[in-house]
A protein has these predicted regions:
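Active-site catalytic microenvironments for nucleophilic, acid-base chemistry
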Residues: 42, 65, 69, 127, ...
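Loop-to-helix element that buttresses phosphate recognition and phosphoryl-transfer chemistry
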Residues: 5-62, 109-122
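Short, basic/glycine-rich phosphate-binding loops at helix/coil junctions
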Residues: 16-19, 95-108
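Internal catalytic-core helix/loop-beta-alpha segment
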Residues: 101-136
Length: 200
């Protein structure tokens, strides 16, 4: 049985301000770093066959502070949604120019569509399952794979896991430094946990 552990990076200044952040490579805040270290304590009792992470600094810092820096492999598929001209802007700022604008329903000028991010997410899922399939030869009961990445790409990945279109990611809220787990109920792919704060 494969379980994918989705771990959103810790807090950044832009996440606090609600700015769309994809390719802008900014670090964690001090609180974000503290939460990332706490993640390490929370995850210490779980064995991961593989750890994949986004190449961005905020994901790398979270992964390293959680204690997985030495084993993590960069997966380009875990980059955040490319927001194009909307990078660094809040939804409120964009809506002042384009009333009713929403990232899930409107064109992303100079960036990616949700469907394109979905294709990347499908690739990540395939690679994670390939790792788990190899572990099945070792007769493991549960094969855990950790993914350190960003809100939108992880939300889309969750949607794709359960068979929704990429835009189905709009149904999943995901806070900074929080953990979600995807897995199986018999032969059906399911969400086992979602948006779990480690303080809970």
């Amino acid at each position: 049985m494969t379980q994918l552990w989705l771990i959103r990076h810790g807090e950044t200044e832009w996440s606090v301000e609600g700015k769309h952040t994809s390719h802008t490579d900014i670090p964690l805040t001090e609180l974000g770093r503290q939460r990332a270290a706490e993640l390490g304590k929370y995850l210490a009792g779980t064995t991961f066959l593989a750890v994949l992470r986004s190449p961005m600094q905020r994901a790398r810092e979270t992964c390293e502070l959680a204690g997985f820096g030495d084993v993590a492999v960069v997966d380009e598929g875990l980059r955040e949604w490319n927001y194009g001209v909307y990078e660094g802007r809040t939804s409120r700022e964009i809506q002042a120019e384009i009333p009713g604008w929403g990232v899930w329903k409107d064109p992303i000028i100079g960036g990616e569509t949700a469907e394109q991010v979905g294709v990347r997410a499908d690739g990540v899922i395939a690679r994670a399952l390939a790792v788990a399939h190899g572990a099945a030869q070792e007769e493991r009961e549960v094969s855990n794979v950790a993914l350190f990445a960003h809100a939108h790409v992880l939300r889309i990945l969750a949607a794709r896991w359960i068979g929704l279109e990429a835009r189905g990611g709009r149904l999943f809220a995901l806070g900074t430094g929080n953990i979600s787990v995807l897995g199986w109920e018999w032969e059906t792919k399911v969400v086992l946990q979602w948006n779990r704060g480690i303080e809970k």
